[in-house]
Amino acid sequence: MTGEKIRSLHRDQKPSKDEDLLEPDEEATADGTFTRTSKLKSSKMFSNHKVIRSPSNPALLQNHHHHHQQQISPMTPGESKTDVYFPVHECVIKGDIRKLSSLIRSHNIGQKDNHGNTPLHLAVMLGNKECAHLLLAHNAPVKVKNAQGWSPLAEAISYGDRQMITALLRKLKQQSRESVEEKRPRLLKALKELGDFYLELHWDFQSWVPLLSRILPSDACKIYKQGINIRLDTTLIDFTDMKCQRGDLSFIFNGDAAPSESFVVLDNEQKVYQRIHHEESEMETEEEVDILMSSDIYSATLSTKSITFSRAQTGWLFREDKTERVGNFLADFYTVNGLILESRKRREHLTEEDILRNKAIMESLSKGGNLMEQTFEPVRRPSLTPPPPNTITWEEYISAENGKAPHLGRELVCKENKKTFKATIAMSQDFPLEIESLLNVLEVIAPFKHFNKLREFVQMKLPPGFPVKLDIPVFPTITATVTFQEFHYGEFEDAIFTIPDDYKEDPSRFPDL
């Protein structure tokens, strides 16, 4: 990826595919709901959900347990959208549970229709519990989003059936764990083949919200990699779009250990450590559902449909391509054009009291208030009164124009916002590491949400070289400038990757772990 040296041939780079790079805050909630207490799981620093990049062709989304499902052909150019048959979707809208049972083993239940909905989306929107539970029993994907950027979990929160929200949340976590376990052998193999090295990078966070800018952090991260072990030293313990928490923290990944023992976090000030676990108690799940039901539903995507990279220029009279040193590395600077941040916020499931309380918390935080000081405790939320029964027929739904699907479920209360994201990226031909190697390392430390954003961004088709400095969107109102300042190969003491003898285990040190 770093091979080509002829810069003049690459003045303008265009990605090969359209990808939505910015997921909502990668919490256990998976839908970017604004979270409000550091004591609860929904504001986790370490989420057990990694970004699972969906194939660009929705028809390739396979049901996890059925590798030999019948493929339904996607539309071809010139073909009418009603010519493509979606029998599973039709069963769900018609509430035909018997026919759905007969089709479910032979059809791709993760397929999207021409509105981007999967059968699970439709079942949840319509409040069809029988169909939804049958689809979940066959591992229908929960994280997948429709054309408007909403997952089945988001639609379940809107509908307001507590039991359904809980079932989807549990299935989402199960699927995320399975995805991590599936990737593990490939990841360990890639790490083993990679040389041992030290990498230092700097994070500088900014916001276009004036009051927020002054409370945003910066962070110098040190990454050590040896064999299949990784250590990350950081001062930024937790960072969401609403708060940051500072400290002296080390995150250690031991590839030789059992999956449940692989991850440990050291608090170097308190001299305690905590293992990262993925299982949650019944109470934690219930608290998370309470927060989901009392918060905005949020979706944010970074659209790359029209993205281009053009060489940045320098000089007043005689303009020339900008090439400067970043740390120890000579780099070509590019301007990133055509990135659009699209965000949507829904609140049809909230009461006026919820909205006022959420607004007060956000105002307190924007003035520098500490989330830890908030006295908010979630109230156990009952199910909402269901919306009026659906009267839209299958024919009306499927024949509707793409992007204008008849609304199913509770009447929408939605705000949309589009913002052009201006960014610069510096690519170096001298950097010893390849992007693919960086992606493998970032995948290990993806539980840190801001690192996950970096991993998503560098998966784009970038100009030639290694991105030694780049601007990335981390949250809808927050961007980060990431600078790779130092890199060298070398060997390290084994002690770097082990828990010091004088550290004590404290399973409750990080309540959100």
From Swiss-Prot:
Q: Which PROSITE patterns match?
A: ANK_REP_REGION (PS50297), ANK_REPEAT (PS50088)
User: What GO terms in the biological process aspect are recorded for it?
Assistant: protein retention in ER lumen
Question: Which UniProt keywords are given for this protein, alphabetically ordered?
Answer: ANK repeat, Chaperone, Endoplasmic reticulum, Membrane, Repeat
Which residues does the annotated region (Disordered) include?
1-34, 55-77
Signal sequence bounds: none
Which cysteines are disulphide-bonded?
A: none
Bias (Basic and acidic residues) occurs at 1-19
- Spell out where the chain crosses the membrane: none
Recorded GO terms, molecular function? Answer: signaling receptor binding
Q: Where are the ANK repeats?
A: 83-114, 115-144, 148-177
Q: Which InterPro entries match?
A: ANKRD13, ANKRD13_C, Ankyrin_rpt, Ankyrin_rpt-contain_sf
Specify the domain of life of the species encoding this protein: Eukaryota
The free-text function statement in the UniProt record for this protein reads: Acts as a molecular chaperone for G protein-coupled receptors, regulating their biogenesis and exit from the ER.
UniProt-recorded name of the protein: Ankyrin repeat domain-containing protein 13C-B
Native source species: Xenopus laevis
Organismal lineage: Eukaryota, Metazoa, Chordata, Craniata, Vertebrata
Provide the gene name from the record.
Answer: ankrd13c-b
